[in-house]
């Protein structure tokens, strides 16, 4: 096996971004599900219920105290450093039942993720979305994990 030198012309794991859209994951802070604990959910005290602390995204989120701004900013920098395109981002929000979190927290997670993509802090989510239309790092897709339980 030989070592490769990774540069912006030779991204690590190019399959991840071959379509031109780069996935970026933000993890919600841990919260017990309103319906109780499912048999198949391994979660612990410091992780969202449906995840273990071994997942790279969870480890990054834990290290950043689940701050959506920091998760987005740091991951964006890392993806750029690895040579992935960062102009078109698919924002993936993980962590269980999104709709069971307070509405203010839901808006805050999305807004702060947009703030990091925009490189500046907006007054509200609407302003953050508007700025993102012309940002260097545009959110072109958003996937919010939600369990039907």
Give the ranges of each region predicted by the language model.
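Cys/His-coordinated zinc-binding microdomains
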Residues: 42
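N-terminal [4Fe-4S]-dependent radical SAM core
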Residues: 1-37, 45-68, 73, 77-79, ...
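Conserved SAM/AdoMet-binding glycine-rich loop
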Residues: 77-149
């Amino acid at each position: 096996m030989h070592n490769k030198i990774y540069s912006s012309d030779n991204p690590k794991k190019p399959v991840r971004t071959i379509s031109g859209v780069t996935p970026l994951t933000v993890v919600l802070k841990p919260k017990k599900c309103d319906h109780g604990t499912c048999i198949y959910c391994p979660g612990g005290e410091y992780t969202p219920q449906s995840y273990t602390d071994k997942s790279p995204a969870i480890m990054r989120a834990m290290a950043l105290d689940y701050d959506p701004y920091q998760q987005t900013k740091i991951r964006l920098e890392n993806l750029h450093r690895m040579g992935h395109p960062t102009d078109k981002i698919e924002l993936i929000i993980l962590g269980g039942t999104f709709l069971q979190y307070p509405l203010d927290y839901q808006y805050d997670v999305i807004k702060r993720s947009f703030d990091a993509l925009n490189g500046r802090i907006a007054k509200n989510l609407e302003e953050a979305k508007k700025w993102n239309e012309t940002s260097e790092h545009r959110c072109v897709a958003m996937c919010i994990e939600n369990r039907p339980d």
